[in-house]
Amino acid sequence: MTREHASPFALRRRSLIRMGATLAAAAPLLHARPGAAASDPKIVEAARKEGSVSLYSSASTGPSNAIAEAFRKKYGIPVTVYRAGSADVATRVQTEEAAGRPQADALIIEEPALTLLQPFLAAYDSPERAPLAPEYKAPDSTLIRMYVSQIGWNTQMVKAEAAPKDWPDLLDPRWKGRFGSLDPHVTATTLAWQVMVGQLYGPDYLAKFGANRPKLYASTNAMSQAIVSGEIEVGITNSFGVIQMAETGAPMAGVTPKHTVLFGGNIAVFAKAPRPNAARLFCDFACSAEGQTVVNVAGATIPTHPGASAPAAGNLAEMSKVHVFSQPDHKRIIADTQKLLAEWEKHVK
């Protein structure tokens, strides 16, 4: 299977609907207690001898720490988490590999950074991913969590009827200096959004977007905090950021524009993992219904395992009926990264 088939960005609309239908058909399972991961006892024993796991993750702090702690409780193996934006994670991995001193065992990351790091990943067909649809599996990675781009706003500062509902609405002068965006230098997923709006609205969109002077943030968490604190009124964020804030009672709401990007968080094992057995055991746990429930409940994201449950994240089948998901070519985005960043820097200051 090619990398393009492994990622929801590259899947056609009918495949997304079919994937959503697969999860919908499993609805009775979604409310059941997730089954426990059942890894090879020999791998468990070898992993315990290795003593720990080093996880590099671009997922938010909540889900990254939650799955690390759940793994520790289950196997007695501590997990050290390095958490950063996908661009920073990729840079750290490349730097360590170039120096001949790889430090990480396992990886949780989104595209296009996943494709960028593919040369450093090991093929691993975890037994725990057997129930997953083929679209979620590549030889060297497994899709375990999904979320979409949204527009979020502070409900105390912006009335719902006045809030921007689509990407062109952000060009309205009323939002000048009062809205935010994730920084593509730190969070590479912003490049996928940049490609999407360029295709939808033409090259002038980014110039008009920049003229409205968005404030830039390094993570979804930082963006959400800025919105609820009133530092900004509106922001381009992700569905999980809105859900998590709303669940705490914070003054934040959001909307998914008709055209949006469906992002996916993937689990992978490094080819030169210092602790290869612990890496595989962690991957098994992350792929399982048990592990996916932990990471997706903590992250307010959509699981790919039919036995996992994260009700707050929404239903992919229903979303597929009303939304058109962007399908950027990740290899092309990687090849054009410097060009895309130069275009961003030209207009967004």
Regions found by a protein language model. Give the residues of each.
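Extracytoplasmic ligand-binding site segments that recognize negatively charged/polar headgroups
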Residues: S54-A68, T80-E97, R101-E231
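Periplasmic-binding protein-like
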Residues: P134, Y147, W175-H185, A207-G210, L216-Y217, A286-S309, ...
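A bilobed periplasmic-binding-protein/Venus flytrap-type ligand-binding module shared by bacterial periplasmic
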Residues: Q150-M157, Q194-V195, G264-A278, V294-V297
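A ligand-binding cleft/hinge motif common to bilobed small-molecule-binding domains
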Residues: P112-Q118, E233-P251
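N-terminal secretory signal peptides
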Residues: M1-S15, M19-H31
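Extracellular/periplasmic bilobal clamshell ligand-binding domains
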Residues: A312-K349
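C-terminal segment of N-terminal export signals and the immediately downstream linker at the start
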Residues: F9-L11, P28-K49
